[in-house]
A protein has these predicted regions:
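Extended beta-strand/loop cores of jelly-roll/beta-sandwich
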Residues: 1-141, 150, 264-293
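Functional-site microenvironments in short loops/helix caps that host divalent-cation chemistry
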Residues: 39, 106, 111, 117-263, ...
């Protein structure tokens, strides 16, 4: 069976051109990931010559453990501000990133949207409701499995498994060139560097991705083997991908943050940013079959 036709009872379907265009793009950008079993977490002690971990203790990558996943599809690109605008416009919601710092990022076309966790979750679920497809945020396990091209023992989710500034991830100078008008930019337009072997872009660069899971420091010690979805509750959500440098860019590195980002303010109380431009996301479709474009 191939998913593709919209459900006859799709929720609140908006026939606007912008929504139709977004749905076409969202489906066309999906990469099918065949399910399988892999060793999730820091595989350094088991695979490297010196038997040392890749991930420092503050990256929560241990212990490595076996995980089995069903097949799914994941977007090759992060969601952009243009994509997110189509969603908020369709629901008559105010557009995001209009404050002093955030608005500078959205002025550059195809820049990843910086959002809070609930906004990312709601966007993916909305895509599911208007398309009839089981869209959602990826689980942490799905994200790492796809980043490592179906669980290969590669430390970085780049075209060659290495982190090479200026070649497969952006250098500081390249970020400045792509994001003129933004001081010390953290993200830049999507798809500017080669994808990983699975065909996914910006998995080791260009900000982090929110995933579905609540964060627990010790979750790996008792994670279920099949299709783990993280703890039942928590206070922080997991983010994957690069935050600051080559260490946080490791495919096994885990980051945590409160679902609602605390606004940045000036001394006089003026809010200059109510989201973090570095907090992006992409969606998955939880179907065992490929999705028709």
């Amino acid at each position: 069976m191939l998913w593709g036709a919209a459900s006859s009872n799709a929720w609140a379907f908006d026939n606007s051109l912008a929504v139709k265009t977004l749905l076409q793009k969202a489906k066309a950008d999906l990469v099918f990931v065949k399910g399988g079993t892999f060793k999730m977490g820091d595989f350094g002690p088991e695979t490297t010559r010196d038997k040392l971990p890749y991930v420092p203790s503050y990256g929560y990558g241990s212990p490595a453990h076996e995980v089995q996943l069903d097949s799914f599809s994941i977007s090759k690109f992060k969601v952009t501000y243009e994509d997110f605008d189509a969603y908020t416009d369709a629901l008559s919601k105010p557009r995001i990133a209009t404050l002093r710092i955030d608005s500078k990022y959205r002025k550059v076309p195809n820049t990843p949207a910086g959002v809070n966790w609930q906004e990312a979750k709601d966007y993916c679920l909305w895509l599911g409701k208007v398309s009839g497809l089981p869209f959602d945020l990826p689980t942490e396990a799905q994200w790492e499995y796809a980043a490592r091209s179906r669980g290969k023992f590669v430390p970085y989710a780049t075209n060659n498994g290495k982190y090479e500034e200026g070649r497969n991830v952006a250098s500081y100078e390249q970020k400045q060139e792509m994001m003129r008008g933004v001081s010390s930019p953290q993200v830049y337009p999507i798809g500017k560097f080669p994808p990983n072997p699975l065909g996914l872009y910006d998995m080791a660069s260009n900000g982090t991705d929110w995933v579905n899971d609540w964060f627990s420091e010790n979750y790996y010690a008792h994670s279920p083997r099949k299709n783990p979805r993280g703890p039942e509750t928590g206070t922080e959500k997991v983010r994957r991908g690069i935050a600051t440098d080559y260490v946080t860019a490791l495919a096994m590195y885990r980051q945590k943050q409160a679902p609602q980002v605390k606004p940045s303010t000036l001394d006089d109380g003026t809010i200059i940013s109510d989201r973090h431009p570095n907090n992006g996301f992409r969606c998955v479709v939880n179907s065992p079959s490929k999705v028709l474009p």
